[in-house]
A protein has these predicted regions:
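S-adenosyl-L-methionine-dependent methyltransferase catalytic core, i.e., the SAM/SAH-binding region
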Residues: 1-310
Length: 310
């Protein structure tokens, strides 16, 4: 296994996928291929479909997964389109799906991608380098009201108005071109008490901009609305999230499919059309253990939710 990349909650994911040697499985967020490698290694006549919006990830994971031959198919695409991708491949149903949400460790570590507030780089933050919208566009072109909204909603940043105002004033002088230029602007907007906090002052703002650039929350909603329909009865859905916004969407998506009919009890016939299609395997999210946290501090905020198709 690549020492530079440790798959989060690997044992828990593999255990909960209930992998059959002849099954069909989807890794909707391929990344470096760590989860996929373990899934593919348990297949004999089965198939793994690996999806990622990042072409760099497809290339790297492709090399890692090459020994598995035609047991693995890799697709450049967005996990939000998992159901459509499976349709395009002629696959009617699968036995398990795994989604590891958010930015990947390699994306954070590759300075030139512009995800990190610790190193200077062009403002980019695109998970898919072929997409049009970048962090530069958001920071330099979006109106102050939208900047404030995403800081509040996606970053849960209490100083959102001050930061949005500072960005607009700074870009009026000249465009904000790099990550550390943006960090300086954010710092200038925050009170001294906030700058003394343990958390980096730019963390929430960078999260908000990254989520906006990649439309991450809408992607999770769309995936939860459509992907579970491609599971066979007994198939498992495993979703790893890293912050409360993602986890809330996943939790709500599972709950909606668990409850089935929403018609009033006194209604003679169902008119809502909802039927129960999932059941939670664990009521509470599965968290990393002490041993994993010691080996991989980046796993500290990870939560795994598992549901089964019924």
């Amino acid at each position: 296994m690549d020492a530079g990349h440790i798959p989060v909650l690997l044992h828990e994911c593999i255990e909960n996928l209930n992998i059959r040697p002849d099954g069909i499985y989807v890794d909707g967020t391929l990344g470096m291929g760590g989860h996929s490698e373990q899934i593919a290694g348990r297949l004999t006549t089965g198939t793994l479909i690996g999806i990622d919006r990042d072409e760099t990830a497809i290339v790297r994971a492709g090399a890692r997964l090459a020994p598995f031959g035609d047991r693995v198919q890799l697709v450049h695409g967005n996990f939000r389109d998992t159901a459509a991708i499976l349709d395009r491949l002629g696959i009617g149903a699968v036995d398990g799906m795994l989604f590891d949400l958010g930015v990947s460790s390699p994306q954070l570590d590759e300075t030139q991608r512009g995800f990190s507030y610790m190193h200077d780089a062009p403002l980019d933050m695109r998970m898919d380098a072929t997409s049009g919208l970048s962090a530069w566009n958001v920071v330099n072109e979006w109106p102050e009201s939208e900047l404030k909204r995403i800081m509040y909603e996606y970053g849960e940043e209490r100083y959102a108005p001050r930061i949005a105002g500072a960005i607009v004033r700074a870009r009026a002088q000249q465009p904000i071109a790099t990550t550390l230029e943006l960090v300086d602007v954010i710092r200038s907007a925050m009170p001294g008490a906030a700058l003394r906090e343990k958390q980096h002052p730019a963390k929430r703002s960078f999260q908000a901009i990254r989520i906006a650039v990649n439309d991450e929350l809408a992607a999770v909603r769309e995936m939860m609305d459509t992907a579970p329909d491609k599971l066979r009865v007994g198939g498992r859905l495993c979703v790893i999230s890293f912050h409360s916004l993602e986890d809330r969407i996943v939790k709500t998506g599972i709950a909606r499919r668990e409850h089935g009919c929403t018609c009033p009890r006194e209604a003679p016939v169902c008119t809502c059309g909802f039927v129960q299609t999932l059941r939670s395997v664990s009521r509470k999210p599965i968290l990393p253990g002490k041993e994993e946290l010691e080996c991989n501090p980046r796993a500290r905020s990870a939560k795994l939710r598992v549901a089964e198709r019924i």
